[in-house]
Amino acid sequence: MIKHKQAKVLIMLCCICSMLAACNTLGQIGDSVRFNTSTANLENALDSLYKNYPEYKMPATWAKYKSSIVKVSPSPYTEDKFFYFKSNPEELYYVVLINDSVMTDDSARTRLAIRAVNRGSDKWILESGLDNDAEETIIKRFDDEIVSKLRVYTKSKVLKEE
């Protein structure tokens, strides 16, 4: 009987720990985009993108919103990125670069995932706050304007992953 109680306690502790571990995660909008290239190569591609298309850089007037989304302690395998879109609707995407070599020892792939969208207020919109049409519009815009250019710069195959 004691083993049964110990098993219940252990299961409860595991459930509590997994809930606490998920507290600082935001989820993601759509699937992550996997580039079959190294993190260094994708970082260089991002630098080229911002150099050739400076309009995607976060404007100073939008920098005040950064602190309301980037509260979580930095992870050794993610890096925060922001992409600004001036055209209608004006939006700022909070995206993370996920370094798979740190997590899986696979240095030949790196992922980008949209975590949240801001439309000019202190409130960031997470996936749970979007209807299907809005989510699809965000994903299409990111794919058409950002991913397509990064694919060319990295010369790599790009796949979608959940």
Q: What is each residue range found by the language model?
A:
Residues M1-I11:
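Bacterial N-terminal signal peptides that target proteins for export
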Residues G27-E162:
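Ser/Thr-rich, low-complexity intrinsically disordered terminal regions
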Residues M19-A22:
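C-terminal motif of bacterial Sec signal peptides marking the signal peptidase cleavage site
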